[in-house]
Amino acid sequence: MANITAALVKELREKTGAGMMDCKGALNETNGDLEAAVDWLRKKGLAKAAKKAGRVAAEGLVAVESAGRHAAVVEVNSETDFVARNDGFQAFAREAAKLALNTDGTLEGLQAATFPGSSETVQEKLSNLIATIGENMTLRRVAKLEVSKGVIASYVHGQINEGLGKIGVLVALESEGDVEFLSTLGRQIAMHVAATNPTALDASGVDQAVVERESNILREKNAGKPDHVMAKIVESGLKSYYKEVTLLEQPFVHDGSKTVSQILKEAAGKAGGEVAIKGFVRYALGEGIEKEEGPDFAAEVASMSR
Protein backbone atom coordinates (compact mmCIF):
# COMPACT_ATOMS: atom_id res chain seq x y z
CA MET A 1 0.00 0.00 0.00
CA ALA A 2 1.25 3.48 -0.87
CA ASN A 3 2.32 5.85 1.89
CA ILE A 4 -0.50 8.40 2.01
CA THR A 5 1.08 11.50 3.55
CA ALA A 6 -0.69 14.52 5.00
CA ALA A 7 0.91 16.65 2.29
CA LEU A 8 -0.58 14.44 -0.43
CA VAL A 9 -4.02 14.63 1.16
CA LYS A 10 -3.69 18.42 1.42
CA GLU A 11 -2.74 18.71 -2.25
CA LEU A 12 -5.72 16.60 -3.31
CA ARG A 13 -8.06 18.71 -1.17
CA GLU A 14 -6.73 21.87 -2.82
CA LYS A 15 -7.19 20.42 -6.29
CA THR A 16 -10.73 19.14 -5.73
CA GLY A 17 -12.35 20.91 -2.77
CA ALA A 18 -13.32 17.49 -1.37
CA GLY A 19 -13.28 16.66 2.36
CA MET A 20 -10.22 15.28 4.13
CA MET A 21 -11.60 11.78 4.71
CA ASP A 22 -12.87 11.56 1.14
CA CYS A 23 -9.41 12.54 -0.11
CA LYS A 24 -7.74 9.93 2.09
CA GLY A 25 -10.16 7.30 0.82
CA ALA A 26 -9.54 8.30 -2.79
CA LEU A 27 -5.77 8.08 -2.38
CA ASN A 28 -6.06 4.68 -0.72
CA GLU A 29 -8.29 3.44 -3.54
CA THR A 30 -5.83 4.65 -6.20
CA ASN A 31 -2.63 3.60 -4.42
CA GLY A 32 -1.50 7.19 -3.94
CA ASP A 33 -1.87 8.24 -7.60
CA LEU A 34 -2.89 11.91 -7.36
CA GLU A 35 -4.44 12.30 -10.83
CA ALA A 36 -6.29 8.99 -10.53
CA ALA A 37 -7.58 10.13 -7.12
CA VAL A 38 -8.95 13.33 -8.70
CA ASP A 39 -10.88 11.24 -11.23
CA TRP A 40 -12.04 8.82 -8.52
CA LEU A 41 -13.52 11.68 -6.48
CA ARG A 42 -15.20 13.18 -9.53
CA LYS A 43 -16.75 9.84 -10.47
CA LYS A 44 -18.16 9.61 -6.94
CA GLY A 45 -19.52 13.15 -7.22
CA LEU A 46 -17.25 14.32 -4.40
CA ALA A 47 -15.10 16.77 -6.35
CA LYS A 48 -15.83 19.81 -8.45
CA ALA A 49 -15.57 19.33 -12.21
CA ALA A 50 -13.84 22.66 -12.57
CA LYS A 51 -10.28 22.99 -13.79
CA LYS A 52 -7.50 22.56 -11.26
CA ALA A 53 -6.59 25.67 -9.32
CA GLY A 54 -3.61 27.43 -10.81
CA ARG A 55 -0.73 26.71 -8.46
CA VAL A 56 2.69 28.20 -8.98
CA ALA A 57 5.87 28.63 -6.97
CA ALA A 58 8.34 30.14 -9.45
CA GLU A 59 9.06 33.84 -9.12
CA GLY A 60 10.06 36.25 -11.87
CA LEU A 61 8.11 38.24 -14.43
CA VAL A 62 5.88 37.93 -17.45
CA ALA A 63 6.70 40.66 -19.99
CA VAL A 64 4.43 41.88 -22.79
CA GLU A 65 5.39 43.99 -25.79
CA SER A 66 2.94 45.05 -28.49
CA ALA A 67 3.25 47.03 -31.71
CA GLY A 68 -0.12 47.39 -33.38
CA ARG A 69 -0.76 44.23 -35.36
CA HIS A 70 1.87 42.08 -33.68
CA ALA A 71 2.80 41.42 -30.06
CA ALA A 72 4.85 39.05 -27.92
CA VAL A 73 4.87 37.74 -24.38
CA VAL A 74 7.76 36.10 -22.52
CA GLU A 75 8.20 34.54 -19.10
CA VAL A 76 11.49 34.93 -17.25
CA ASN A 77 11.83 33.07 -13.94
CA SER A 78 13.94 33.83 -10.90
CA GLU A 79 14.27 32.14 -7.53
CA THR A 80 12.91 35.07 -5.49
CA ASP A 81 10.49 37.95 -5.89
CA PHE A 82 13.28 40.23 -4.65
CA VAL A 83 15.28 39.58 -7.84
CA ALA A 84 12.15 40.09 -9.96
CA ARG A 85 12.14 43.68 -8.70
CA ASN A 86 15.78 44.20 -9.66
CA ASP A 87 16.22 46.86 -12.37
CA GLY A 88 18.63 44.67 -14.34
CA PHE A 89 16.26 41.71 -14.30
CA GLN A 90 13.33 43.88 -15.39
CA ALA A 91 15.37 45.43 -18.19
CA PHE A 92 16.30 41.96 -19.44
CA ALA A 93 12.67 40.77 -19.43
CA ARG A 94 11.52 43.90 -21.25
CA GLU A 95 14.22 43.64 -23.93
CA ALA A 96 13.52 39.93 -24.39
CA ALA A 97 9.86 40.72 -25.11
CA LYS A 98 10.84 43.45 -27.60
CA LEU A 99 13.26 41.10 -29.35
CA ALA A 100 10.58 38.41 -29.56
CA LEU A 101 8.58 40.68 -31.88
CA ASN A 102 11.23 40.16 -34.55
CA THR A 103 11.98 36.47 -34.04
CA ASP A 104 10.17 33.37 -35.28
CA GLY A 105 8.24 33.14 -32.01
CA THR A 106 10.16 30.12 -30.71
CA LEU A 107 12.16 29.93 -27.50
CA GLU A 108 15.23 28.75 -29.39
CA GLY A 109 14.98 31.66 -31.81
CA LEU A 110 14.79 34.18 -28.98
CA GLN A 111 17.66 32.62 -27.04
CA ALA A 112 19.88 32.82 -30.12
CA ALA A 113 18.98 36.44 -30.97
CA THR A 114 21.58 39.14 -30.37
CA PHE A 115 20.88 41.19 -27.26
CA PRO A 116 20.66 44.96 -28.00
CA GLY A 117 23.83 46.94 -27.33
CA SER A 118 26.09 43.89 -27.16
CA SER A 119 27.56 41.04 -29.17
CA GLU A 120 26.02 38.49 -26.79
CA THR A 121 23.04 36.31 -27.50
CA VAL A 122 20.00 36.58 -25.25
CA GLN A 123 20.99 33.34 -23.52
CA GLU A 124 24.55 34.58 -22.95
CA LYS A 125 23.21 37.84 -21.56
CA LEU A 126 21.04 35.88 -19.14
CA SER A 127 24.02 33.75 -18.05
CA ASN A 128 26.00 36.91 -17.29
CA LEU A 129 23.04 38.33 -15.37
CA ILE A 130 22.94 35.14 -13.29
CA ALA A 131 26.62 35.56 -12.46
CA THR A 132 26.12 39.23 -11.55
CA ILE A 133 23.02 38.84 -9.37
CA GLY A 134 23.95 35.44 -7.97
CA GLU A 135 20.60 33.73 -8.45
CA ASN A 136 19.44 31.20 -11.01
CA MET A 137 17.17 32.56 -13.75
CA THR A 138 15.45 30.98 -16.73
CA LEU A 139 13.97 32.30 -19.95
CA ARG A 140 11.11 29.84 -19.81
CA ARG A 141 8.82 30.47 -22.78
CA VAL A 142 7.76 32.92 -25.47
CA ALA A 143 4.73 33.41 -27.72
CA LYS A 144 3.97 35.77 -30.56
CA LEU A 145 0.71 36.76 -32.28
CA GLU A 146 0.14 38.64 -35.54
CA VAL A 147 -2.84 39.75 -37.61
CA SER A 148 -2.90 41.19 -41.13
CA LYS A 149 -5.84 43.42 -40.22
CA GLY A 150 -7.13 44.39 -36.80
CA VAL A 151 -5.22 44.63 -33.52
CA ILE A 152 -3.35 42.58 -30.96
CA ALA A 153 -4.60 43.69 -27.55
CA SER A 154 -2.70 43.01 -24.34
CA TYR A 155 -3.23 43.05 -20.59
CA VAL A 156 -0.84 42.60 -17.69
CA HIS A 157 -2.20 41.62 -14.29
CA GLY A 158 -0.24 42.36 -11.12
CA GLN A 159 1.79 44.93 -13.03
CA ILE A 160 4.89 46.17 -11.18
CA ASN A 161 6.23 48.21 -14.09
CA GLU A 162 5.09 49.02 -17.61
CA GLY A 163 4.41 45.74 -19.41
CA LEU A 164 5.76 43.62 -16.55
CA GLY A 165 3.70 41.59 -14.10
CA LYS A 166 2.46 38.21 -12.90
CA ILE A 167 0.08 37.39 -15.77
CA GLY A 168 0.36 38.51 -19.38
CA VAL A 169 -2.35 38.09 -22.01
CA LEU A 170 -2.44 38.70 -25.76
CA VAL A 171 -5.65 38.62 -27.81
CA ALA A 172 -5.61 38.80 -31.62
CA LEU A 173 -8.70 40.52 -33.04
CA GLU A 174 -9.07 40.23 -36.80
CA SER A 175 -11.27 42.93 -38.31
CA GLU A 176 -11.36 45.79 -40.80
CA GLY A 177 -13.26 47.86 -38.24
CA ASP A 178 -12.31 50.93 -36.21
CA VAL A 179 -8.92 50.37 -34.59
CA GLU A 180 -9.67 52.45 -31.49
CA PHE A 181 -12.85 50.51 -30.79
CA LEU A 182 -11.07 47.21 -31.43
CA SER A 183 -8.27 48.15 -29.02
CA THR A 184 -10.76 48.84 -26.23
CA LEU A 185 -12.71 45.64 -26.90
CA GLY A 186 -9.50 43.64 -27.17
CA ARG A 187 -8.27 44.84 -23.80
CA GLN A 188 -11.59 43.89 -22.19
CA ILE A 189 -11.34 40.40 -23.69
CA ALA A 190 -7.70 40.15 -22.57
CA MET A 191 -8.79 40.98 -19.01
CA HIS A 192 -11.47 38.29 -19.34
CA VAL A 193 -8.84 35.75 -20.41
CA ALA A 194 -6.65 36.72 -17.45
CA ALA A 195 -9.55 36.11 -15.08
CA THR A 196 -11.09 32.94 -16.51
CA ASN A 197 -8.07 31.13 -18.01
CA PRO A 198 -9.78 29.42 -20.98
CA THR A 199 -7.90 26.45 -22.41
CA ALA A 200 -9.11 26.82 -26.00
CA LEU A 201 -10.90 29.25 -28.30
CA ASP A 202 -13.77 26.85 -29.04
CA ALA A 203 -14.69 23.17 -28.66
CA SER A 204 -12.60 22.15 -31.68
CA GLY A 205 -9.48 23.33 -29.89
CA VAL A 206 -9.95 21.23 -26.75
CA ASP A 207 -7.53 18.32 -26.51
CA GLN A 208 -9.37 15.14 -27.53
CA ALA A 209 -7.74 13.23 -24.67
CA VAL A 210 -9.34 15.71 -22.27
CA VAL A 211 -12.72 15.35 -24.00
CA GLU A 212 -12.50 11.57 -23.69
CA ARG A 213 -11.56 11.85 -20.03
CA GLU A 214 -14.56 14.10 -19.31
CA SER A 215 -16.83 11.74 -21.26
CA ASN A 216 -15.61 8.71 -19.30
CA ILE A 217 -16.21 10.48 -15.99
CA LEU A 218 -19.76 11.33 -17.05
CA ARG A 219 -20.41 7.73 -18.12
CA GLU A 220 -19.08 6.26 -14.88
CA LYS A 221 -21.02 8.74 -12.74
CA ASN A 222 -24.19 7.71 -14.55
CA ALA A 223 -23.49 4.00 -14.97
CA GLY A 224 -26.59 1.89 -15.54
CA LYS A 225 -28.51 4.45 -17.59
CA PRO A 226 -29.95 3.32 -20.95
CA ASP A 227 -27.72 4.04 -23.94
CA HIS A 228 -29.98 6.73 -25.42
CA VAL A 229 -30.13 8.50 -22.05
CA MET A 230 -26.39 8.16 -21.53
CA ALA A 231 -25.69 9.77 -24.91
CA LYS A 232 -27.75 12.82 -23.94
CA ILE A 233 -26.07 13.02 -20.53
CA VAL A 234 -22.61 12.99 -22.09
CA GLU A 235 -23.61 15.54 -24.73
CA SER A 236 -25.10 17.87 -22.11
CA GLY A 237 -22.14 17.40 -19.77
CA LEU A 238 -19.64 18.25 -22.49
CA LYS A 239 -21.60 21.36 -23.44
CA SER A 240 -21.36 22.52 -19.83
CA TYR A 241 -17.66 21.72 -19.80
CA TYR A 242 -17.05 23.71 -22.99
CA LYS A 243 -18.81 26.70 -21.41
CA GLU A 244 -16.22 26.56 -18.63
CA VAL A 245 -13.07 26.14 -20.67
CA THR A 246 -13.60 27.64 -24.17
CA LEU A 247 -13.24 31.38 -24.59
CA LEU A 248 -16.09 31.93 -27.04
CA GLU A 249 -18.63 30.07 -24.88
CA GLN A 250 -17.67 31.60 -21.53
CA PRO A 251 -19.94 34.25 -19.96
CA PHE A 252 -18.18 37.58 -20.50
CA VAL A 253 -16.56 38.81 -17.28
CA HIS A 254 -17.73 42.38 -17.94
CA ASP A 255 -21.33 41.32 -18.73
CA GLY A 256 -22.27 37.89 -17.42
CA SER A 257 -25.56 37.85 -19.35
CA LYS A 258 -23.69 37.36 -22.63
CA THR A 259 -21.02 34.99 -23.91
CA VAL A 260 -17.82 36.24 -25.52
CA SER A 261 -19.17 34.99 -28.85
CA GLN A 262 -22.28 37.16 -28.45
CA ILE A 263 -20.14 40.15 -27.52
CA LEU A 264 -18.18 39.75 -30.76
CA LYS A 265 -21.38 39.62 -32.85
CA GLU A 266 -22.65 42.81 -31.21
CA ALA A 267 -19.26 44.46 -31.71
CA ALA A 268 -19.47 44.11 -35.50
CA GLY A 269 -22.00 46.95 -35.78
CA LYS A 270 -20.02 49.26 -33.52
CA ALA A 271 -16.67 48.48 -35.14
CA GLY A 272 -17.92 48.84 -38.69
CA GLY A 273 -16.99 45.31 -39.68
CA GLU A 274 -17.02 41.71 -38.46
CA VAL A 275 -14.78 40.96 -35.48
CA ALA A 276 -13.16 37.57 -34.88
CA ILE A 277 -10.67 36.29 -32.34
CA LYS A 278 -7.81 34.77 -34.31
CA GLY A 279 -5.98 33.55 -31.22
CA PHE A 280 -4.99 34.30 -27.65
CA VAL A 281 -2.14 33.60 -25.25
CA ARG A 282 -2.22 33.65 -21.45
CA TYR A 283 1.00 33.28 -19.45
CA ALA A 284 0.73 33.04 -15.67
CA LEU A 285 4.02 33.25 -13.83
CA GLY A 286 5.37 29.82 -12.95
CA GLU A 287 2.33 27.97 -14.27
CA GLY A 288 2.42 24.32 -13.31
CA ILE A 289 4.69 24.70 -10.28
CA GLU A 290 3.13 25.01 -6.80
CA LYS A 291 1.65 28.25 -5.42
CA GLU A 292 -1.98 29.09 -4.95
CA GLU A 293 -3.60 32.11 -6.52
CA GLY A 294 -6.15 34.22 -4.66
CA PRO A 295 -9.69 32.79 -4.39
CA ASP A 296 -11.45 35.88 -5.79
CA PHE A 297 -9.15 36.44 -8.76
CA ALA A 298 -11.91 36.64 -11.39
CA ALA A 299 -13.82 39.19 -9.31
CA GLU A 300 -10.63 41.20 -8.80
CA VAL A 301 -10.00 41.49 -12.54
CA ALA A 302 -13.64 42.24 -13.30
CA SER A 303 -13.73 45.03 -10.70
CA MET A 304 -10.77 46.75 -12.35
CA SER A 305 -12.82 47.41 -15.49
CA ARG A 306 -15.65 49.19 -13.73
Curated annotation (Swiss-Prot):
Report any Pfam family annotated for this entry.
EF_TS
GO CC term (a single one): cytoplasm
Known CDD domains for this protein?
A: UBA_EF-Ts
Protein's UniProt keywords contain Nucleotide-binding: no
Superkingdom of the source species = Bacteria
Which function does this protein serve?
A: Associates with the EF-Tu.GDP complex and induces the exchange of GDP to GTP. It remains bound to the aminoacyl-tRNA.EF-Tu.GTP complex up to the GTP hydrolysis stage on the ribosome.
HAMAP family for the chain: EF_Ts
In which family does this protein belong, per the annotation? Answer: Belongs to the EF-Ts family.
Which species is this UniProt entry from? Methylorubrum extorquens (strain PA1)
One MF annotation (Gene Ontology) recorded for this entry:
translation elongation factor activity
* Location in the cell: Cytoplasm
Could you list this entry's UniProt keywords, alphabetically sorted: Cytoplasm, Elongation factor, Protein biosynthesis
Q: Which region ranges are annotated with the description Involved in Mg(2+) ion dislocation from EF-Tu?
A: 80-83
Q: InterPro entries, alphabetically?
A: EF-Ts_dimer_sf (IPR036402), Transl_elong_EFTs/EF1B (IPR001816), Transl_elong_EFTs/EF1B_dimer (IPR014039), Transl_elong_Ts_CS (IPR018101), UBA-like_sf (IPR009060)
This protein is called what?
Answer: Elongation factor Ts
